Design a protein with these regions (language model features):
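A glycine-rich, often tryptophan-bearing local segment used as a flexible ligand/cofactor-contacting loop or short
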Residues: 73-151
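Bacterial Sec-dependent N-terminal signal peptides
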Residues: 1-24
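Glycine-centered loop/turn motifs
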Residues: 62-64, 151, 365, 548
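Glycan-recognition and catalytic cores of secretory/periplasmic carbohydrate-active enzymes
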Residues: 216-587
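Carbohydrate-active enzymes and regulators
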Residues: 32-33, 42-45, 60-61, 65-66, ...
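Catalytic beta-strand/loop cores that center a nucleophilic Ser/Cys/Thr
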Residues: 118-191, 195-198
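Extracellular ligand-binding/catalytic regions of CAZymes and related secreted enzymes
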Residues: 96, 166-253
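Helical hinge/lid and interdomain linker segments adjacent to catalytic or ligand-binding clefts
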Residues: 25-107
Length: 587
């Protein structure tokens, strides 16, 4: 009898515990498999899905919560009729609906896709959602109505800023995104219920938004979520001890990314995908490749990669552009991974990429010994007559590293000819400038550039060519290579920081100086060269934070190519730094 009593007591405790974990019952309509439905179920809420909006509103007890979620986003919006509105009012329900097609007599008058717009918090909602803070609902599709809502919490607008709208909502169109239609009805103008699939960011703010919505829906003040669904997360936490082979694992994952993303061009899809979307190179953007597409072996090159643009369903756009610097850099990645991991397939891809690079981007006048363009590598498949020194240098640095790892001399001639081609278009002071166009080079001849007095205090464009020149000097002891680099580096260091030009951030410019300074000390180890290297390294590391990342920094705005975005209207028109002001946490 004593045992039966204990068992009965344990079952009672288990029953009470299970009851305690079940939270409010919520009547719902829409996609029962959505991220929001799954989250609420995992959190212990009891969701009762109905087959129609009318059924959900009719079945909901008075003063209870109702969720009306988009049944098929983006094809079909949610419809609430006038009868539904009347019943919501009479029963004093709290209703949240997303992606509305109709609200009473008001019909959606416009369906629009956000492109450059971000989500702006109008007034402070939570500590994580202060006024003017930003979220990204990537290319979400908005439903707009003529009738103004009672209260607007979030709007979609094209605004400048890193994590807040620094210029406010002035001089930019705004579109209500989360608002209260009346006391009983809160509306999201897009579908927010698949927030994880759609990769809405940042996650902490999206979570806080839903906690705010749920507190309103349940008429509470303490709703929080114990977990949060995500499809992208770090491999390790900030405090987790790394395994001994963490570096090796990261390299293995890094090179497999090329295959997971299908970046190696395959002959079966080259014409219908790579060539089609590359076009003339001005907007070489298209949808991601289907998951079942085969991967190439490097003999047709590697795509530039992903765009930052994400579609409403979480898929990401591709840059179907074929750039030569990508070929050289990727060949290095495959060679390093192949050597470390013992993967002959990776080494073969590396070799094929180098063959492709020198075959495809050194054609025509670039392969004619009598041409002033001889040895140079074209910037891209669509812009072979544009010669950026920094792009040539990136390709050559990758080629040098890959060929060294593979212990191959197959590309030595092309590598040296490319370095010389760049050097003979470098002026007396050691500077080459941004880019040289082939028509100008054919007209002027290479001596025009070799004898110029150009000074260009812009490491982005100059520094890695210097590293290439110094590498060639070490092999040949050809004195003009060293002399021109020393002249250029001396002027560059003397002009730091006030006279430096910068592209997307001053930290990137500092970082680019490390390699040529290291090579300069290697080939001529003087106290001055050592001091320069130490100084620039210390300048770079001033912004290193506890996790090891080196924070980006903006320089003198008057010296920038793409600096701080000056207005809401200017946002998204050009390249820009990832940060808006110094201190923004971006490495």
């Amino acid at each position: 009898m004593h045992k039966l009593g204990i068992i009965s007591f344990l079952f009672s405790c288990l029953f009470l515990f299970s009851c305690g974990t079940n939270k409010e019952k919520i009547v719902c309509y829409g996609d029962a498999k959505s991220n929001l439905a799954q989250l609420l179920t995992d959190e212990g809420y009891q969701l009762q899905f109905c087959s129609s909006v009318a059924e959900a509103i009719q079945k909901a007890p008075e003063q209870s919560p109702v969720l009306l979620l988009a049944p098929s986003y983006p094809e079909k919006g949610t419809v609430v009729t006038s009868e539904d509105l009347n019943l919501i009012q009479s029963k004093a329900l709290r209703v949240f609906m997303d992606y509305p097609q109709q609200i009473g007599k008001n019909m959606c008058v416009k369906t629009d896709t956000m492109v450059l717009e971000r989500v702006v918090v109008c007034d402070s909602l939570t500590p994580q959602l202060p006024a003017m803070s930003l979220m990204c609902f990537h290319r979400c599709i908005l439903k707009e109505f003529d009738q103004a809502p009672d209260s607007t919490y979030l709007v979609a607008a094209k605004v400048a800023g890193f994590d807040n709208a620094v210029y406010g909502l002035a001089n930019t169109p705004v579109h209500p995104l989360l608002y209260q239609q009346n006391n009983q009805l809160m509306v999201a103008a897009t579908s927010v219920s698949n927030f994880a699939t759609s990769r809405y960011l940042p996650e902490q703010r999206v979570q806080s938004m839903f906690e705010y919505i749920m507190n309103w829906l349940l008429q509470k003040q303490d709703v929080t979520f114990s977990s949060w669904p995500t499809y992208v997360s770090p491999s390790y936490s900030a405090t987790e001890q790394l395994p001994k082979d963490a570096g090796k694992q990261s390299i293995a994952k890094g090179v497999e990314w090329y295959y997971n993303a299908h970046l190696l061009v395959h002959p079966s899809w080259k014409k219908d995908w790579a060539d089609k979307y590359m076009g003339d190179g001005l907007a070489p953007v298209g949808p991601e490749l289907p998951a079942d597409m085969p991967d190439g072996d490097g003999s047709l090159g590697v795509l530039e990669g992903h765009m930052s643009s994400i579609y409403y369903d979480g898929k990401q756009q591709y840059r179907y552009w074929m750039r030569d610097d990508v070929q050289g850099e990727s060949s290095y990645a495959f060679a390093a991974a192949g050597d470390l991991l013992g993967k002959q397939d990776y080494l073969k891809v590396s070799s094929n990429l180098l063959d492709y690079s020198f075959r495809e981007y050194r054609d025509s006048v670039r392969n004619n010994p009598k041409s002033p363009s001889y040895g140079l590598l074209g910037w891209a498949y669509t812009h072979k007559g544009t010669y950026y020194g920094d792009d040539n240098a990136r390709s050559i640095l990758g080629s040098l590293a890959a060929s060294s790892i593979m212990n191959s001399t197959s590309w030595d001639k092309q590598i040296v000819e490319c370095i010389v081609g760049n050097f003979r278009t470098t002026g007396k002071n050691g500077f080459r400038g941004g880019n040289i166009l082939d028509p100008d080079l054919q007209k002027n001849g290479w001596r025009h550039y070799f004898n110029s007095d150009l000074v260009n205090l812009h490491p982005h464009f100059e520094s890695w060519n210097w590293a290439c020149y110094l590498w060639l000097y070490e092999q040949t002891k050809y004195q003009p290579l060293l002399d021109r680099v020393k002249k250029g580096v001396s002027l560059m260091m003397a002009g730091y920081p006030n006279d430096w030009n910068w592209t997307n951030g001053i930290q990137q410019e500092r970082a680019r100086m490390i390699l040529p300074l290291a090579w300069l000390y290697r080939v001529e180890p003087t106290d001055q060269h050592k001091q320069w290297l130490q100084f620039m390294t210390e300048e770079l590391l001033k912004n290193q934070v506890a996790c090891g990342g080196i924070r980006e920094e903006l320089g003198d705005e008057s010296k920038s190519m793409f600096g701080c975005t000056p207005s809401n209207d200017a946002y998204g028109r050009t390249e820009a730094s990832l940060i808006f002001k110094n201190g923004d946490p971006v490495a």
